[in-house]
Amino acid sequence: MEQAPNMAEPRGPVDHGVQIRFITEPVSGAEMGTLRRGGRRPAKDARASTYGVAVRVQGIAGQPFVVLNSGEKGGDSFGVQIKGANDQGASGALSSDLELPENPYSQVKGFPAPSQSSTSDEEPGAYWNGKLLRSHSQASLAGPGPVDPSNRSNSMLELAPKVASPGSTIDTAPLSSVDSLINKFDSQLGGQARGRTGRRTRMLPPEQRKRSKSLDSRLPRDTFEERERQSTNHWTSSTKYDNHVGTSKQPAQSQNLSPLSGFSRSRQTQDWVLQSFEEPRRSAQDPTMLQFKSTPDLLRDQQEAAPPGSVDHMKATIYGILREGSSESETSVRRKVSLVLEKMQPLVMVSSGSTKAVAGQGELTRKVEELQRKLDEEVKKRQKLEPSQVGLERQLEEKTEECSRLQELLERRKGEAQQSNKELQNMKRLLDQGEDLRHGLETQVMELQNKLKHVQGPEPAKEVLLKDLLETRELLEEVLEGKQRVEEQLRLRERELTALKGALKEEVASRDQEVEHVRQQYQRDTEQLRRSMQDATQDHAVLEAERQKMSALVRGLQRELEETSEETGHWQSMFQKNKEDLRATKQELLQLRMEKEEMEEELGEKIEVLQRELEQARASAGDTRQVEVLKKELLRTQEELKELQAERQSQEVAGRHRDRELEKQLAVLRVEADRGRELEEQNLQLQKTLQQLRQDCEEASKAKMVAEAEATVLGQRRAAVETTLRETQEENDEFRRRILGLEQQLKETRGLVDGGEAVEARLRDKLQRLEAEKQQLEEALNASQEEEGSLAAAKRALEARLEEAQRGLARLGQEQQTLNRALEEEGKQREVLRRGKAELEEQKRLLDRTVDRLNKELEKIGEDSKQALQQLQAQLEDYKEKARREVADAQRQAKDWASEAEKTSGGLSRLQDEIQRLRQALQASQAERDTARLDKELLAQRLQGLEQEAENKKRSQDDRARQLKGLEEKVSRLETELDEEKNTVELLTDRVNRGRDQVDQLRTELMQERSARQDLECDKISLERQNKDLKTRLASSEGFQKPSASLSQLESQNQLLQERLQAEEREKTVLQSTNRKLERKVKELSIQIEDERQHVNDQKDQLSLRVKALKRQVDEAEEEIERLDGLRKKAQREVEEQHEVNEQLQARIKSLEKDSWRKASRSAAESALKNEGLSSDEEFDSVYDPSSIASLLTESNLQTSSC
């Protein structure tokens, strides 16, 4: 459409060529009105009865003009001009002029603009409404009726899509003259005039010989002659295309038909040829390739062209048209015909290839756009994940600061422990001093007895007194022997405890060695598993099996959650029982206090009675010397009693100080327990952060191009957080071990204090028992918390193992279930032990030691379970690393797929370039068929490479299957190791049963001790009776006897009794103080138990929430796996589509080769029929009738659709 204004300008002489005009019969106004293209009506008035053929030959200078008709200037004529490679919008390729100008070279308005600008059928605005014109649509060529011109234009545009050409491709060459051609015609015929009689004398100025000065100004001046050569080439090719129109006029004249019918058939032939072949040839070919050889002399140009052969009917028709009205030789006309047909062949080949290339190019551009959009989405996702990195680093810094603070607190605790050790040594020294004093008092008592023996006389009263003294001494000895027996029993129990400690330590060491060996073996196995599982993620069947196993694992986690809830209920019931036990001990302490007060009252009364008796004895004594001696002895004994009382008071003060220290240490233990809870809360926070990290990982897994780097960073951060968690757990364990050491030291100090008196020892033992119970409760709470933490860690690890192999997940689930069962059995055993402890509450001295021993055994069992859980955690961490590596491998594979897609896109672009080169080569000549073959070989090589890659992938899948079999064997071996662990747990249960038997034995011993206590109380009562008897005897003897040596003996007995009373008072005070302390401790323990129960409930709620979160994350992980599987399938489909595109390209190359071979064979066959000279109009019509043209067009369409 851009050329329409240019064609409307005044035109000078055009290029070399021939213009053929048909002079028609008069037709109706309606019919002739439709023949206009530019809106003008032909002038039919002056030449209503003229007809014939007018041939106009244009010379070198544009002067000669030959017309073969009736001699009149006007007349309906149709000019056909066929050009070579021209711009898309050139409408002058086919021209029909309804008026023959008088002399187109003498005036500027020789060719009317409408006629020149509207004759091309390629213009969308062109139309034909004549009754005898056939449609130009290739789909309706076989049809009889006319069709809408819009359909004709659109079909032509669809057959040969227009490609926009730059402005430089417009034919801007000046119209050179053809004087040389006309002069040559004149010289060959001996100066005989051709066409019109007169030579045109008027010469056009040079500026009118150009089409457009504005267009010529685009090119430099030095290309002017080159454009002249091109313009001559256009006119030469134009003439060869359109010369067949003339012969269709002859049968119209002979049969008295409308002259438009023959024209319509010739116009149809011209239209489908030009519409389907000229447009792609202009857009695809380089003008340099289609620059035909042209010279100013048309005859010499025709002689140099070698005809490749064409259809004989067309050749005859064009030959007749060129021959009529011309005086040229027969050889020159035949050369023109062959040249016209030669230019039509490459256009036929170009038409089929252009539509295929455009379709393939559109598909490739769509794929490139889709890949670019995916890349942009991945970049955006990566930018979203970057802010989470800063928060994780900040959390790691906070955790390191907390670890440093905990280390400082540990150092302070060490200093406090050393100070407590020093205080315990001081207390031990004081106890030794008290023992020395006791031995001194016993020696003094012995001396007094010896003195009494010397003073003894034959009187019967003295003998009675001696007997009483002997009896009292025997009783005292029996009491001392009972005390020694009790102390020996205590020493035996302590030795047994030390022996049990050593055995437990040895067993713990052996257990640690076994666990270390198993851990090393497991690390080696897991390393091999990690190496073997790196390439297993592409297997579809394995992914499906893993998904099913993960659903089963979620159900197992739910069962574990129910078991943990049952365990928490069990712990609550235990806490309630312990609380009841503490209440019972409190009642017992109150009862003891009341008994002690009663004993103090009785002793006070006895002391008052003895003092009154002594005063009476002094008043009645006659011998002053004996009285003085007795007074001195009494003073000495009173001073010794005062010293003993002072020592007792100092010991009591030391005991109070020790009790305060114990309370401080208990407070420290509470602080440590609170700190442990804080650490557990921090662990929960860390678990929350880990859950957030997992969510980030799930979001990062959606980014195929970026997920590898993100996964490695998240893995490192997760490992750092897990190391911090492990460090905090280790610190907690170390704190607990140190607390246990301190408590053992406290027990040793209590054992030293037990060497004083039996009552004080019993009370201290009871205190130890209560503290041991508290410790047991704390340890039970810590064990439950650790078990909950281990369960949470196991769940977290199991969540991370969603992407691991199926058998590894099943094995870990079984191991965890077995450990949970072992923990349940241990809990049951603990419950049985606590029931035994409830039965042994009344046992004062031996029960607490047996309970301590059992607690130590339970601690060992808990440590074994902790070690097993730590081993599981290490295994889970290894599996986490393996999962991260698998994710990294999957991301690398995704990148490989993306790179393959980019390579395929690059390969497609290269294939497009090759297709373009192949099209140009096919348009240029058959010689470029070798390059197409080379391209075909390259494509075959690429297909072979892709097939080899597929085979390599299959081999890698087979290798992965073998590796999975090896993994199954390793899993079976680990299961056997788990069975061994079960056996060790059974051994531990047997050991606990043995401890239970020992508890029963200690119970019997406690009953024996109780019976001994009752015997001692009976002895005490008997001694009191004897004392009363002695008092009565002393009163009766004082009435009728003088004071004698027996008085001193009685006074010594009184002193002994006073000492015993004082000892009883001191014991009473100690009991009261210890009872008060025990009451306070019982209250504190009850409060602590309530707090711990609340904490356990909170942990239970947190566990339930965490399990729900784990379920949700498992579902999300399954969805992510399905999404990745879909992406992988999509990538495979794209690769398969690329294979199909390659196969289509190969098929297209083969079809093009077949077409070229077919056309070569056809040209060879037609060259054989070249000399037959078929010139009849009927034969031409039989070859170019609508049915044959439709068959040709449908054949080209079939070729296009097959590509």
Curated annotation (Swiss-Prot):
Keyword line: Acetylation, Cell junction, Coiled coil, Phosphoprotein, Tight junction
Gene this chain is encoded by: CGN
Subcellular location as annotated: Cell junction, Tight junction
PANTHER family: CINGULIN (PTHR46349:SF4), CINGULIN-LIKE PROTEIN 1-RELATED (PTHR46349)
The keyword Cytoplasm is assigned to this record: no
Motif (ZIM): 48-62
Tissue: Localized on the cytoplasmic face of tight junctions of polarized epithelia and some endothelia. Expressed in pancreas, kidney, liver and lung, but not in skeletal muscle, placenta, brain or heart.
Superkingdom assignment: Eukaryota
Name by which UniProt lists this protein: Cingulin
Interaction with TJP1/ZO1: annotated span: 54-67
Biased amino acid composition, Low complexity: 1044-1053
